[in-house]
Every structure is written in C-alpha cells, then in structure tokens.
C-alpha cells in the first residue's frame, strides 16, 4: 500500500514475457507478467517499499499535503505495510497504528493490530494502540473482488463508509480522511457524511493506480469536529 520524481514511475528497461507453465493458469501468468513489467513494482523493490501501493499515497500526499503536518495516523487495512512506510518516511515523529486481518511484518514506530476492523472492539483497540485521537485516518481497504463491478463497488463502499464513521467519531478537529472507493455511483451516503463533517471533499485517481482500474480515492480535509457539523 502504500519523494517521487517522475510520476509515471519510469518505463525504461526490458519488457519481460512470461511463458505459461503447465500448472499455472493463464490469468496467473498474465498477473505475473504484469507485475514483472510494472514500473511501480520495480520502484517499490528498489526503494524498499513493500508494495506498489506506496506510490498512491505518495502521489496523493504531493497533491493534498496530508502527511508532514500529521502527528497521529491510523492506517486501516495496513498489510503489507507500504502506506505506513510512507507515513513514517514523510514524518518520522508521527505516531502510527494500523489494523488488518492479514499479518503484517513489523514497521519501526508503528503499532500493528492483527484483527478485523469490523470487530466491535477494533476502534477502541486502535485508539489505545495509537495513544490518543488521530489527526489523519487513511484506508486502502477493499473487499475481495468477485468480478461483478457493481457488487465489488458496493462492498468496497461499505468498507469506506465504516472507515469514515470511525474517522468522524475519532478525528481531532482539523484532521483528514483518505479512503479507497470504486467507481460505480453508490457513494452518495458516504459523500453526504463527509461533506457534513469536513470543509473539503474531493476525489482523486493517483497515477500509480493501474490503468483501467475502477479505484478512486476520496480525500476529506478540515474535520469540523463532532459538534460543529451543519
């Protein structure tokens, strides 16, 4: 998940073609070939990030100025850890707590909870691990895709709405929220909630998002506080 000179990630070098092995499906061969030829994958390996998604947050930060002023950050869907790596690199003094059902290798300065964010105990556990309220909540969570665009969209919007509810309940005034959504037109309730509680709400698709991917990110800044929303 996860400075950037040249947002395209660089496209130099050889194109790698992968032959389909006897026990490898055509789809897995295509995935492997895409990975081997992805400039962001190569950059992540060269620069020590755990995933190409790191560059999505880097690019969002370049556009919206999210990280350097943040002192306490919650990373929802932290595994494999690329986004928290970006946070720590941009702001080594920031306190960071992340949560994921999947295991995540330790990251210096980051408290990692291996549990379901949808668990009723998760919000309090995150705030305790962080040591107080956050001023930035970031979420790269996405439901496992089933290949049906509208279903995938609705499931991921559901996660984003839960993440937004956590942010509204816990953010410090002036804080910000970033979450992955899929294009599909069912995000009205999410946007209504965010516009009620934040001064600015925008969508962005960072260059690191794969071409043809339906993913977008919603960026809400200037949290009004729980008592000040119109």
From Swiss-Prot:
Catalysed reactions, as listed in the record: uridine(2552) in 23S rRNA + S-adenosyl-L-methionine = 2'-O-methyluridine(2552) in 23S rRNA + S-adenosyl-L-homocysteine + H(+)
Intracellular or extracellular location(s): Cytoplasm
Positions of the catalytic residues: 180 (proton acceptor)
Keyword annotations: Cytoplasm, Methyltransferase, rRNA processing, S-adenosyl-L-methionine, Transferase
GO molecular function, one term: rRNA (uridine-2'-O-)-methyltransferase activity
EC number: 2.1.1.166
Binding residue positions for S-adenosyl-L-methionine: 81, 83, 100, 116, 140
GO cellular component: cytoplasm
Source organism superkingdom: Bacteria
Membrane-spanning ranges: none
Function summary: Specifically methylates the uridine in position 2552 of 23S rRNA at the 2'-O position of the ribose in the fully assembled 50S ribosomal subunit.
InterPro entries linked: RNA_methyltr_RlmE, RNA_MeTrfase_FtsJ_dom, rRNA-MeTfrase_E, SAM-dependent_MTases_sf
Region named Disordered: 1-22
Pfam families xref list: FtsJ
Lineage, highest ranks first: Bacteria, Pseudomonadati, Pseudomonadota, Alphaproteobacteria, Sphingomonadales
Family recorded in the similarity comment: Belongs to the class I-like SAM-binding methyltransferase superfamily. RNA methyltransferase RlmE family.
Record protein name field: Ribosomal RNA large subunit methyltransferase E
Main location: cytoplasm
Gly residues: compositionally biased ranges: 1-13
């Amino acid at each position: 998940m996860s400075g950037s000179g040249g947002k395209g990630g660089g496209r130099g070098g050889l194109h790698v073609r992968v032959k389909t092995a006897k026990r490898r499906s055509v789809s897995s061969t295509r995935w492997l070939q895409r990975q081997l030829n992805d400039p962001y994958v190569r950059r992540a390996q060269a620069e020590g990030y755990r995933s190409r998604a790191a560059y999505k947050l880097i690019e969002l930060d370049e556009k919206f100025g999210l990280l350097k002023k943040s002192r306490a950050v919650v990373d929802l869907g932290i595994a494999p850890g690329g986004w928290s790596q970006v946070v720590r690199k941009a702001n080594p003094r920031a306190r960071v707590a992340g949560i994921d059902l999947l295991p995540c290798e330790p990251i210096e300065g980051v408290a990692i909870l291996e549990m379901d964010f949808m668990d009723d105990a998760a919000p309090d556990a995150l705030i305790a691990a962080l040591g107080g309220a956050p001023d930035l909540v970031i979420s790269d969570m996405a439901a496992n895709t089933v290949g049906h665009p509208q279903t995938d969209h609705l499931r991921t919007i559901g996660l984003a709405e839960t993440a937004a509810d956590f942010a509204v309940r816990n953010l410090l005034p002036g804080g910000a929220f970033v979450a992955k959504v899929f294009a599909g037109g069912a995000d009205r309730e999410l946007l209504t909630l965010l516009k009620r509680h934040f001064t600015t709400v925008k969508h962005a698709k960072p260059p690191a998002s794969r071409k043809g991917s339906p993913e977008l990110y919603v960026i809400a800044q200037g949290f009004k506080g729980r008592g000040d929303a119109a």
